Amino acid sequence: MRRIFVVLPVSTEKWIKETKECVSKVISGATEVHVTNLPGAPTSIETYYDSAKAASLVVDAIVKAEMEGYNAAVIGCFEDPGLHASRELVSMPVLGIGETSIVIASILGKRIAIISTGRNSRAVYERKMIEMGLYRKLAYSCGMELPVL
């Protein structure tokens, strides 16, 4: 049986049930999926500081998950805190929903747009597109002044 570890890099338990329900609709019955939050993390990821604060907790959780026999990990936040550091430390695949979404959108469309919460998110995702070498595909990016919670 395959085992996938999904880490929500926030302290709130608000999205655990919803994430489990979404995953159960698309995952094979032969795959076990464990979804968890991170006590001690920010309640939401809305700033660079929030992301930085959550990153080491994400990395620690993913390293532990690999030791517990998980075959892959998913970081359930578009900001992908701790993604690259996790990949340095484990041998299993680690996906961030932000990076993965951008790659898939870039494959499916000639240009993409990113609309997110938080007035500073435009700069965050433009930087992410530059780092990924996909900035030329970005047609539009904006951050709306909406809190995550």
Question: Where in this protein do the model-derived segments appear?
Answer:
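Short, well-structured alpha-helical segments in soluble
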Residues: 52-69
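Active-site rim beta-loop-alpha module in soluble metabolic enzymes
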Residues: 126-149
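N-terminal beta-loop-helix "entrance" segment that forms/cooperates
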Residues: 36-56, 149
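Short, acidic/small-residue loops that bind anionic groups at enzyme active sites
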Residues: 87-108
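Periplasmic-binding protein-like
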Residues: 6-7, 67-77
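A short, Lys/Arg-enriched amphipathic alpha-helix followed by its capping loop at the start of a domain
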Residues: 19-31
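Short beta-strand segments enriched in small/hydrophobic residues
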Residues: 1-16, 112-116, 144
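Hydrophobic structural segments
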Residues: 31, 110-112
